Design a protein with these regions (language model features):
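Residues within mature, well-folded domains
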Residues: 23-203
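Sec/Tat signal peptide C-region and signal peptidase I cleavage site
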Residues: 18-22
């Protein structure tokens, strides 16, 4: 039985690495609840080609083996009973659905903060700004980046309540601009057209 399991894992790896004729995909809505829940859990970490392969599988047996292989390939300590990465993803999922669903009707994992938390994990720094009359409520998250993945050594993300209401959304320097963070006032002590000035004021 163990040999058969390993053989199936090897087949899935080959399917991911080599182009094969596409088989008819199963719609997510046609999957059992267990597999729909799993796809929700791994939404932000599963590769597009992995998801394609998963949706081409025609039996729950194959899906179970695929899921087992998915986690094993990401296990930082293979050969041990624990899979720290899988446990961490489950932990993050529980956290975001509890913490980030408080100000929105959507599940926490669907929010911008939930998405970033699922991908990046807990930020090294998290500053909540809600008591400055010049600024809309916002949060500044900071991370140490992984240079091997092309990330800067240190970077920050801003989440803010657009117009001061609703859920926190990820700030975009190009799409939003610094003024979107600011409550209009003619006597501000910083340049509202400079994101560096606004961030410096937050800090």
């Amino acid at each position: 039985m163990k040999f058969k399991t390993y053989a199936w894992i090897a087949i899935f790896i080959v399917l991911l690495a080599v182009p094969v004729p596409a088989q008819k995909k199963v719609k997510e809505s046609q999957l059992g609840q267990k597999y729909r829940d799993w796809l929700t859990l791994v939404t932000y970490i599963i590769l597009p080609q992995e998801k394609d392969v998963f949706l081409q599988l025609q039996s729950d047996f194959d899906r179970d083996i695929f899921i087992d292989s998915f986690w094993k390939q990401r296990d930082p300590t293979p050969g041990t009973p624990e899979n720290e990465y899988r446990d961490e993803i489950n932990k993050r999922f529980l956290y975001v659905n509890k913490e980030f669903a408080k100000d929105t009707p959507r599940p926490g994992w669907m929010t911008d903060r939930g998405r970033i938390y699922m991908i990046m994990g807990e930020p090294q720094g998290r500053d909540k700004i809600g008591n400055l009359p010049e600024l809309h409520p916002c949060e500044l998250w900071s991370y140490y980046g992984d240079v091997s993945l092309g990330q800067p050594t240190y970077f920050g993300l801003i989440f803010f309540r657009r117009q001061g209401i609703g859920e926190y959304t990820l700030y975009s320097p190009t799409g939003d601009g610094p003024k979107s963070l600011v409550v209009f006032s003619p006597n501000l002590g910083f340049n509202v057209d400079s994101i560096s000035d606004v961030v410096q004021y937050i800090r």
